[in-house]
Curated annotation (Swiss-Prot):
Keyword S-adenosyl-L-methionine in annotation: yes
Record-given protein name: Ribosomal RNA small subunit methyltransferase G
Annotated organism of origin: Bacillus mycoides (strain KBAB4)
A molecular function (GO) term: rRNA (guanine-N7-)-methyltransferase activity
Lineage: Bacteria, Bacillati, Bacillota, Bacilli, Bacillales
SUPFAM superfamilies per UniProt: S-adenosyl-L-methionine-dependent methyltransferases
């Protein structure tokens, strides 16, 4: 996906990028590749691949959810900033918090935010399991997002405690999401969430399947969740 295709395919979905926003994506790409030489941020470094599999793929969430309001967003395990930084570039009014367990990635994101001149972006070096227990962030976000971090039964325990009641947890998944949903239904129920919508589409050019799950927070999450670091992965909430 070249830059012109990136721009026109977003335009088709009602997302018009200014020359400044396109410049920000260019700076993002250059900074990602430069830092990737000294630390492992991504296996994808070829320009057209980055624009398709990282930038465009991140923004697809906005094809199925309206980001036009100044929502507070928490991105769990964003790694090199996906999906929240591409969304922030497209929708500058969003208030973004990224939580990642690796300090080196947080250093990269701080540097990136300065280079992109982003405001209303904050980064936290923490495990999602401990972050989700903290006062002031628990059940504080309009939207919590995660892209390809863990299977749904595990991911729900990391993300739903952070979503305010009435807010949305957006899980961005690859193929075979139906099986994950089946295994994750019980966890959603326990944690106060309910699957509202699942959208399946093909990523252009390479035609690989993507699924976006919109999960509504219906009730408060029981205080015992999230459990201590590592437990959600070892003992997921499954029947």
């Amino acid at each position: 996906m070249n830059i012109e295709q990136f721009q026109s395919m977003l335009e088709e979905k009602g997302i018009s990028l200014s020359s400044r926003q396109l410049e920000q994506f260019g700076i993002y790409f250059e900074t990602l590749v430069e830092w990737n030489e000294k630390m492992n941020l991504t296996a994808i470094t070829e320009k057209e691949e980055v624009y398709l599999k990282h930038f465009f793929d991140s923004v697809t969430a906005a094809f199925y959810y309206d980001f036009s309001k100044p929502f507070s967003i928490c991105d769990v395990g964003a790694g090199a900033g996906f999906p929240s930084i591409p969304l922030k570039i497209c929708f500058p009014h969003l208030k973004v918090k990224i939580v990642d367990s690796l300090q080196k990635r947080i250093n990269f994101l701080n540097h990136l935010a300065q280079k992109l001149e982003l405001s209303d972006v904050a980064f936290c070096h923490d495990r999602a399991e401990t972050f989700g227990k903290k006062e002031g962030v628990r059940e504080a976000y309009d939207i919590v997002m995660a892209r390809a971090v863990a299977r749904l039964s595990v991911l729900s325990e990391l993300c739903l405690p952070l979503v305010k009641v009435g807010g949305t947890f957006i899980a961005m998944k690859g193929a075979a999401a139906n099986e994950e949903i089946e295994n994750g239904k019980y966890a959603l129920e326990v944690l106060g969430g309910e699957l509202k919508e699942m959208s399946t589409f093909q990523l252009p050019f390479e035609e690989s399947e993507r699924n976006i799950l919109l999960i509504e927070k219906k009730r408060k999450t029981p205080k015992k969740y999230p459990r201590k670091p590592g437990t959600p992965n070892k003992l997921p909430i499954e029947k």
